[in-house]
Amino acid sequence: MATSDKHAAARRSALSALKTLQDQGRRVFRTGDFQPEDRRRLLNMGYLDEVLRGWFIISSPANRKSDTTAWHASYWQFIAGYFNDRFGADWVLSPAQSLALHAENMTVPKQILVYSSAASNNMTKLPHGSSIYDNRSKTMPTADEAAVRNGLRLWTPATALVRVPEHYFAASHLDVSVVLRSMRDIGEVVEALISPPRPVVAGRLANAFRQVDREDAADEIVDSFRRLLGQRVVETNQFKRPVFGLGNVGESPISLRLRGMWQESREHVIDAFNEADVPPAAAVNDIDSYMRDVDEIYRNDAYNSLSIEGYKITDGLIARVSTPDWDPYNDDGNKADHDALAARGYFQAFSQVKEAVRRVVNGGDSASELRTGYLHWYQEMFQPMVAVGLLQAKTLVRHRSHQVYLRGSRHVPPQEGVVNEAMNTLMDLIAKEPKHSVRAVLGHWIFGYVHPFGDGNGRAARFAMNVLLAGGGYPWTVIRVEDRADYLDSLEAASVEHDIHPFARFIAERVRWSLDNRPRAKMMGECSKPSFTRSP
């Protein structure tokens, strides 16, 4: 066998070994998971990255060293695997981190604190500025106080509430509020408070329950201390800020989380639109003129929206795929051209969205159009890839059934098992929101936060935004590719730092610009591919 053939066979063997482990749902590996030669080849080819000595995560040869995607995608699996290997069952995440995870907050932290009776009180640096600190502790959860979630050992919600430091209530009020509101059995909290007695913590939690409209739970805590222990509980408010209504008692954490995000953010959107001097919502008087503007802005919108996602788009390509005689079935060039297929899918989806906009400006409800339409728009986006055999039709019939990760972001979208409920909650929030500006801005943000599909979420979120803007008589608003960094940074601030201000200002300013520059949008010329890559 020639040397080149031997190398090719060795590469295939290494990749086959990696695929076998991947098919088991694994992203994190130990030295012994591979034959030494396979491991060396995978590292050299860029398919593995070493995190710590003897610990590896799956990567991609296309990733730059600064790219955080592979690390963030593997982070929680690494934490579970590393500490299970090091301490067995003798470890638990901090009460604060436990509470965050119970509240469906999967954001990758800068540092994670782990307790174990066998810990060495050391900090270990991890990739991209993250770290772990293992804290030796004699106090470990009993079987009743522990919970295991995706291999991560946590304090139960009740015990985490009792053990978090008081400053956590103000620093992470949304996480605390979600867990308080989702608690069904208050007896678990009372049990953790009275054995041993913690009257100060009881006062903190009783007031916290009152802040989220759980008077029954607060009274149960106070009365239990009085009846069972003869102790008086003095309530103290640790939130230090108003707590918004989240939803029904016992509702799922993801629904409560989205409701809380919406309520905390809506006034900031209203303020941003006022500051940008965007006029109040109004009915569209000249519907034909409005729709002509939508038609004329299509090429500009398609170029920018697709370029943001990393496709190589030109004015000529957009024009070519928009013609009735464009044929992906019999043209081998079209079959192999992902940019052309994406551009055609965008044209098909835009056509559907345009009809939804037409119905909205004719008096229809933008929330109803979004609820019934967003899955169809997604299907149209990827139908050309189904047509040429690059995707199976069954992958487009529902929300994602796997976890997704965002390139360069610390935000980890909700797990696949809660996506349906999250999207139903989002649609309800939009339907009940009276302000069209709030519908559009928060609808876009939370659509991307949930990330309901395996791909195309950014395009779908921008479509959703424009349908919702139409409900207020606002013009179709293009997010420009030259603003990509500010756009994504503002979304990151909203999702990770809970700061909606940058994103609200960004969208308000773009809407103001669209109002000032209607009815005609300038067309772009031939443009080359941006220097970034496509992300889900």
Residue positions per predicted region:
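FIC/Doc superfamily catalytic core
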Residues: 1-33, 43-53, 59, 63-536
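Non-catalytic DNA-binding core/recognition domains of DNA-processing enzymes
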Residues: 38-41
